[in-house]
Amino acid sequence: KYSNRHMTIGRVAHITEGTKPGLGRSNCQFRNRCRRGCPFGAYFSSNSSTLPAAEATGNMTLRTNSIVYEVIYDELNKRATGVKIIDSESNLTYEFKAKIIFMCASTVPTTSILMQSKSNRFPNGLGNDSGELGHNIMDHHFQIGADATYDGFEDKYYTGRRPNGIYIPRFQNIGGKTKNTNFLRGYGYQGGASRTDWTKYVKEASYGEKLKQAVIRPGEWTMGLNGFGEVLPYHDNKIFLDYNKTDKWGLPTVTFDAKLRENELNMRKDMQLQAMEMLDNAGFKNV
């Protein structure tokens, strides 16, 4: 029925064979420590990958408790030459100079730093000649889809802690007959299947021996599809600095002014509709 829809294993930023000797990274150990930053270094994070590699060179100095709030711009040489920081413990300010500066503070803090980096050349923030800095916020909109139960496979179970579920790549608005007139762009699904467990009985609908027997047996199979859709770049979806509301270090706080608009709301309707339809056509119940 769905010639243009493909369910595959999800992809993660994992290495498959480890790294050079001495860097201390290995492939996934299936230990369910992903949310701790992966102590095995199997997936990329600065804590387990680039920082240890930089430290191993002997040329890295790591300064903690340092809040970067401005990039220093040299108007004579027309280049960034360093950063200004506040020590979060002493409240003292320092300047650090460098030939090359990498802004790696993630999306919102990096934008905030650039907006605070004002000079005669960049009165509205470093690199903000267009006035677009802080505008066009884009992220996934999600938490919509469908789930269902399945009768059968009662003699089957699963083992291990695979760090990912299934994925259905985007299939709307990719050419040909996939064009949807209700919205632009598209979405994909993340999902997975599992069997219910003892948490199903936390409402205490039963008790005694009946409850004991119920909680030690795997429950029914369930499957969920969770949509992750694109947000269009709207100029009015923005963040800005509030200099009237500062944090404990006297820096302006970041205020968000953004919302989902008609295109995203129409897409969400389709995300739910298609998920329900696929599960129903696959023989699931209680969709």
Segments predicted by a language model, with ranges:
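Generic recognition of stable, solvent-exposed alpha-helical segments in well-folded globular domains
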Residues: Q29, R33, S45-S49, R63, ...
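Structural recognition of the beta-strand scaffold that forms the well-ordered cores
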Residues: I9, M103-C104, F240
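Glycine-rich loop(s) and the adjacent beta-strand/alpha-helix scaffold that form part
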Residues: F40, A56-T57, S66, E70-N77, ...
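Conserved redox-cofactor binding core of oxidoreductases
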Residues: K1-V68
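A glycine-rich dinucleotide-binding beta-alpha-beta segment and adjacent secondary-structure elements
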Residues: T8-G10, R31, Y69-I72, G82, ...
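FAD cofactor-binding and catalytic pocket of flavoenzymes
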Residues: S130-T255, E262
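Generic, well-ordered alpha-helical scaffold segments in large soluble proteins
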Residues: Y2, A53, T57, C104, ...
